[in-house]
Amino acid sequence: MSGHSGHDVKYGRHRTRRSFARISEVLELPNLIEIQTASYQWFLDEGLREMFRDISPIEDFAGNLSLEFIDYDLGEPKYSVEESKNRDANYAAPLRVKLRLINKETGEVKDQEVFMGDFPLMTEMGTFIINGAERVIVSQLVRSPGVYFNGKLDKNGKKGFGSTVIPNRGAWLEYETDAKDVVHVRIDRTRKLPVTVLLRALGFGSDQEIIDLIGDNDYLRNTLEKDNTDNAEKALLEIYERLRPGEPPTVDNARSLLVSRFFDPKRYDLASVGRYKINKKLHLKNRLFNQTLAETLVDPETGEIIASKGDILDRRNLDQIIPNLENGVGFRTLRPTDGVMEDSVLVQSIKIYAPNDDEKEINIIGNAYIEENVKHITPSDIISSISYFFNLLHGVGDTDDIDHLGNRRLRSVGELLQNQFRIGLSRMERVVRERMSIQDMTTITPQQLINIRPVVASIKEFFGSSQLSQFMDQTNPLGELTHKRRLSALGPGGLTRERAGYEVRDVHYSHYGRMCPIETPEGPNIGLINSLSSFAKVNKFGFIETPYRRVDPETNRVTDKIDYLTADEEDNYVVAQANSKLDEQGTFTEEEVMARFRSENLAVEKERIDYMDVSPKQVVSVATACIPFLENDDSNRALMGANMQRQAVPLMHPEAPFVGTGMEHVSAKDSGAAVTAKHDGIVEHVEAREIWVRRVSLVDGKEVTGGIDKYTLRKFVRSNQGTCYNQRPNVAEGDRVVKGEILGNGPSMDSGELALGRNVLVAFMTWDGYNYEDAIIMSERLVKDDVYTSIHIEEFESEARDTKLGPEEMTRDIPNVGEDALRDLDERGIIRVGAEVKDNDLLVGKVTPKGVTELTAEERLLHAIFGEKAREVRDTSLRVPHGGGGIVLDVKIFTREAGDELPPGVNQLVRVYIVQKRKIHEGDKMAGRHGNKGVISRILPEEDMPFMPDGTPVDIMLNPLGVPSRMNIGQVLELHLGMAARALGIHVATPVFDGANEEDVWSTVEEAGMARDAKTVLYDGRSGEAFDNRISVGVMYMIKLAHMVDDKLHARSTGPYSLVTQQPLGGKAQFGGQRFGEMEVWALEAYGAAYTLQEILTIKSDDVVGRVKTYEAIVKGESVPEPGVPESFKVLIKELQSLGMDVKMLSADEEEIEMRDMDDDDFTNQNDAFNIVQPENAATEKTE
């Protein structure tokens, strides 16, 4: 090992890397898709049960019948994962629920098991299979339910406060101050009332009661003056008028309305997280910290004095009295009269002196520790939140920052599903109630009451069309993994792009170790869609936690005890960085340590440290942690680097990077694209499609062999993005494998590591200006040797339907098609597997009946003799679209007869898969891992590329001007280290924030026998002369991105037109034209190019008659006729006429031009070659 820095680390079975890490990892990375699998598991184990418990029992309006949910179980899924994909089905299991119907009059009890629909299951990879496609449910970041206080300035610059009590579902309660120092309340976003009205309605009727409760102060006096009610009943009526304007109020109605709005668990739900947050916020300790007591605290049981009047409660004193507070110090039982609640209310109240005036006493009230299982709001919550608001006005208590991750929580799959299921169940509940009152009570069974349609529909709607249920990004394993770890602030119940301001999107200090500050999309969603950090976990309340190493307070040593902290908890501690220097015992070597406290970065005495980071990469996400030398890149470019790695196309021959970060192995293993061993064992048999492993387990110290596990590998399957999904074995017969080890490489993997691109020889130099503006010049060797060749699989389908005129049929017998076009079709008219097809070739022959007139006797005779040919049919065959040519990989046929489930009206469905081998091409987009992207501008023959002194030509030339202004120097360090690694025949790992420094790079370069500045003389391949200066040449990892020129190239001569304006459609998918827009018209006007302009605006666009005649004229070789009136002009005139204006069109000699109607003969004649629109891409404009 001597002679170089770094040490060897083994990643998986086949790869060893020299790691430059200096910090040893204390904690293994967690399973990276746990956020999906754990949440779904919770839903199956507890979420479903919780929901049935909430809704059960359902009683009829009279209370005679009651339906209870007893138990449920999920059966076996109908199809396996593979089969669900092939059949376009859902991977789902039947949910059966055991119900009990109790007739209270007769005491009769009926039990029955009822089927409640098929419930989609999650695969082991954390995905769902819906209609045969893999989908991912993205976790949603929402505001946590709870009570929030925030400062606000009014228009005169006067400081005030606002406060909101936000439930999980139910009515909001908001408090605010106005310019006259009156405190108002809004119930459920209605008009505001003085806050004392709400207190009176709760049963504190007189002014004196309110003053005794809250404590005397100016704000309260102002509010009481503004309040024109003087007892509980008037207050109730006042509230009722606000909530139900226009209805005649009665006291009873008002009382029951308020009760149902806030104190009914079915209408108002805080969820356990809301109860937890409210108890935490309204606890007295936050407001007592550093305040002076204005009364003596006595233990109610023993009578001993805990703290005396005038004591200042610093942290130590406060910690001592907290247990006493929880035992009932300062508890007061209030007995409200005439209010909403009959019961007494328990609160906890303590008097302190105002911080700015030690004569004045303030009363602080807490909600007296309500049990976790009370999910609705209680009167004591309302009283304490009002008290907190008044305390804030006197400078006691804190306001909240809503962008802090302690106030934002995650709704993962399980909870999103639960909420959706609950909607379905509550719809079902209504139906059940109605049926209970209609049907005969004696004969009724649970089965007859239940209607599962709403439940099934709500689940289907969620998976099929929710904003959070997304088509999985399967471009490569990293894209797949990142998609499952994505956090979105959008979606139902979240933000919208337009409403989200700058603050929500910005990086917040509480994101540290929880959400990646780098990986987020560019564009309108920036900062709203984030990625989970590498070590983060989600706790039971949905808050993101990050691990820290605990520091022993006695010895000040860093222990290996790991605590997971939420953002709230972390706010109380001082946390040291992961790179702080420690000695063998785990003590800090320096007296002052760099540490974080809330949003500050400070140098702190080592005794004050509470925790220490686990790893330098705990800040960033998985994709960001795959960028070597991240610490040398500007963050904007790192963002592009992280995002572009997800768009890497899997290559035919992937190759792991020489310069990695050590994350390649973990991310490949956890992505779900690899085949991993489920048990320890010995490999018995390996072939391309299957691996057999004999299980081996230890029993009493002896090895015992068990059964065989068979692992099937997926070969050449189309991924969601049309890339090729292919798995290859990574083990040999006789290998011993352990549980979790990679048996087979997935796409973009090499030896069990992520391999998104290839290592190529790069020179930073210009070459005749061909790499201007980030363009890339490439050697032809990369094309010849298939270095950047990728495989793409496209799927085309054709269906035979029943039409009004008879069924369509698939056949070889197609009108007006020669035998040579049919040579690769079988007798059913379907292409054979292995055929090579070009644009516009037939894939599936299909004919559709035309409108059949009454046949004459002769026609019937012909029909009887010649069969199909004579019948009126039109050719609606499936043909290869432009740019879709390739080799037919597979054909799948689904028919009604064979028992396949097809949509209504479809008799037969044929899917054809065409595979293309795409070599790299001018116009393709490539990138490095540092956000250095570019388009290939020229592919030079090998002999023209500059070559090194030993004759090796370089592979790629990049423009050196792309580096300084972008400040992504990481690519230059990677280039040099990669060159040295290749020369030494090693792979290196340089983890983020803890990798090779400049000195390490130069010493490795010298070890490889290269010049210390790592530059070399290059010779011009054309002339053989040396270039004037030495040039940086090295090995860089370059990726081919999914933006390929073959997918973007598009040309049109004639094609479909929009129905209203008759202008050509736009976009490649619609086979549209190029829009010659307003500004382009100005350009031609500026040149006075009148004729060109005229034909662009008329016959090339929407002069319906003119374009047909022009087409004919061109075909027959005649001169082009005069253009007519454009259709869009007619549309304009019709619109003006529809507004009641009399608009006419006059010719030059002032004759009125008759506007011919839309259904002009020339235009409707469907037979002219020009206006035929294929029904598949019928002229409907797609709005993107």
From Swiss-Prot:
For this chain's UniProt record, which GO biological process terms are given? DNA-templated transcription
Q: What class of enzyme is it?
A: transferase
Task: State the source organism's domain of life.
Answer: Bacteria
What EC identifiers does the entry list? 2.7.7.6
- Secretion signal span: none
Question: What reaction(s) does this enzyme catalyze?
Answer: RNA(n) + a ribonucleoside 5'-triphosphate = RNA(n+1) + diphosphate
GO terms, molecular function? DNA binding; DNA-directed RNA polymerase activity; ribonucleoside binding
Q: Which parts of this chain are annotated as the region Disordered?
A: 1160-1184
Pfam families from the UniProt entry: RNA_pol_Rpb2_1, RNA_pol_Rpb2_2, RNA_pol_Rpb2_3, RNA_pol_Rpb2_45, RNA_pol_Rpb2_6, RNA_pol_Rpb2_7
**What is one GO cellular-component annotation here?**
DNA-directed RNA polymerase complex
**Which PROSITE patterns does the entry mention?**
RNA_POL_BETA
Q: Which UniProt keywords apply?
A: DNA-directed RNA polymerase, Nucleotidyltransferase, Transcription, Transferase
UniProt xrefs under NCBIfam families: PRK00405.1, rpoB
Q: Which HAMAP family match?
A: RNApol_bact_RpoB (MF_01321)
Functional description taken from the UniProt entry: DNA-dependent RNA polymerase catalyzes the transcription of DNA into RNA using the four ribonucleoside triphosphates as substrates.
Checking PANTHER family in the record gives: DNA-DIRECTED RNA POLYMERASE I SUBUNIT 2
Which family does this protein fall into?
Belongs to the RNA polymerase beta chain family.
* Complex formation: The RNAP catalytic core consists of 2 alpha, 1 beta, 1 beta' and 1 omega subunit. When a sigma factor is associated with the core the holoenzyme is formed, which can initiate transcription.
The name this protein goes by in its record: DNA-directed RNA polymerase subunit beta
What is the source species? Answer: Listeria innocua serovar 6a (strain ATCC BAA-680 / CLIP 11262)
